[in-house]
């Protein structure tokens, strides 16, 4: 809908302060986009693909085409592979070429749909670093993704959608914040550890030698728990207190787990 590829059924949408769809002719030249799985001519080189795509852009200046293509390839780290046929590109290289296509013109906004989906670890790292470098240049980047671990590493702000509605939005720190932390303790003295926690108002469960419990901000401090465990002669092999992951927060916000909403 932002890019005018789908019709708005209700409500209002604005893109760079322009109403959609009426203001798209003014807004879209300032917007670059990468839709999941970008398509290229496999028998053409990366450079020739970009030249062909740029030729189809009525806003593109043909006199600067060659220089702009070379600059876009340089920005995404594909200068050395510019003459290679695209069928020989890795998935990560194809994603970077798709981003280069989105950067052929000066952009205020990049819309990236699943930019790391299906990539191996090396390809994921390449695209992640590229996105960070583009953001550092001052470009606003809007990412649609279900890979929450990647979102945590890349984004500064997040909106969570469930069944077509935004159920939460804010900075990553705000959405990851929680009044409840997860306490995990590894010990051979499981029963004694559970008893110490119970005496301090904490209900714990065990799985083998691992004891787990939820610890709210108003309860005893973690360092005092460790002190009392040691005083009770509980052998502590490991002790961690962690905030819920973004994935866990997502499940809490949307109610989506194995039983996905129908």
List each language-model region with its residue ranges:
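ABC transporter nucleotide-binding domains
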Residues: 1-143, 148-162, 168
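Short, hydrophobic alpha-helical segments
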Residues: 3, 253-254
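Helix N-cap/coil-helix junction residues
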Residues: 59-60, 78, 202, 234, ...
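Short amphipathic beta-strand starts and helix->beta connectors
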Residues: 166-171, 196-200
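Short acidic-hydrophobic catalytic motif
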Residues: 173-177
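Short, charged/small-residue-rich alpha-helical element at the C-terminal edge
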Residues: 180-253
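ABC-family P-loop ATPase nucleotide-binding domain
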Residues: 256-262
């Amino acid at each position: 809908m932002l890019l005018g590829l789908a019709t708005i059924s209700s409500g209002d949408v604005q893109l760079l302060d322009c109403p959609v769809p009426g203001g798209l002719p003014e807004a879209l030249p300032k917007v670059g986009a990468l839709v999941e799985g970008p398509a290229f001519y496999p028998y053409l080189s990366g450079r020739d693909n970009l030249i062909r795509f740029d030729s189809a852009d009525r806003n593109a200046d043909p006199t600067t085409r060659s220089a702009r293509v070379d600059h876009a390839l340089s920005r995404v780290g594909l200068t050395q592979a510019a003459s290679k046929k695209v069928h020989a590109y890795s998935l990560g290289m194809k994603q970077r070429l798709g981003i280069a296509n989105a950067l052929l013109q000066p952009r205020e906004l990049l819309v990236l749909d699943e930019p790391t989906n299906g990539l191996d670890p090396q390809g994921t790292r390449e695209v992640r670093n590229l996105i960070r470098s583009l953001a550092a240049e001052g470009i606003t980047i809007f990412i649609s993704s279900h890979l929450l671990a990647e979102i945590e590493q890349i984004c500064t702000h997040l909106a969570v959608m469930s069944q077509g509605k935004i159920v939460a939005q804010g900075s990553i720190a705000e959405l990851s914040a929680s009044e409840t932390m997860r306490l995990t303790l590894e010990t051979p003295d499981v029963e004694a550890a559970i008893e110490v926690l119970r005496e301090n108002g904490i209900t714990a469960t065990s799985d083998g030698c691992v004891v787990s419990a939820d610890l709210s901000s108003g309860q005893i401090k973690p360092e005092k728990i460790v002190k009392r465990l040691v005083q009770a002669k509980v052998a502590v092999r490991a002790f961690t207190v962690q905030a819920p992951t973004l994935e866990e927060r997502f499940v809490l916000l949307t109610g989506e787990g194995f039983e996905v909403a129908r």
